[in-house]
Amino acid sequence: MNYHQYYPVDIVNGPGTRCTLFVSGCVHECPGCYNKSTWRLNSGMPFTAEMEDRIVNDLNDSRIKRQGISLSGGDPLHPQNVPEILKLVKRIRRECAGKDIWVWTGYKLDELNAQQREVVDLINVLVDGK
């Protein structure tokens, strides 16, 4: 999985102060999309174990209390992104007690496959559709 941008402190993409990750890869081509640069799967930077560690550390940093994380893009539920997103979400659930997880996707809930639904079962809010 690649990502375009990571904001360790964000007050725009969801409630409260939070972390936000914009991943690469989207097939929806929504009219008016403000993140067209994230559509190509191979754009951006590789999502590494170090980046995953950074996100978990930022979520647990007591100096800046964060309500949770927003996962956007691109599309976090693009089939090629789901394995890494699922791994990240599971780790946040294990290691970041009380943090909420919001996911934005161009898919509608009834279009999701089993692996995408596994992600949805672990998050707090899904903003779905085009």
Which positions does each model-derived feature cover?
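Residues embedded in well-ordered beta-strands within globular domains across many folds
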Residues: 70, 124-127
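Conserved Radical SAM active-site core
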Residues: 1-3, 17, 35-103, 109-116
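A generic structural signal for alpha->beta connector loops
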Residues: 98, 122-123
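Short, flexible active-site-adjacent loop segments at beta-strand->alpha-helix junctions, enriched
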Residues: 27, 107, 129
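Classical nucleotidyltransferase
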Residues: 113, 127-130
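N-terminal pre-triad scaffold of radical SAM enzymes
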Residues: 2-29
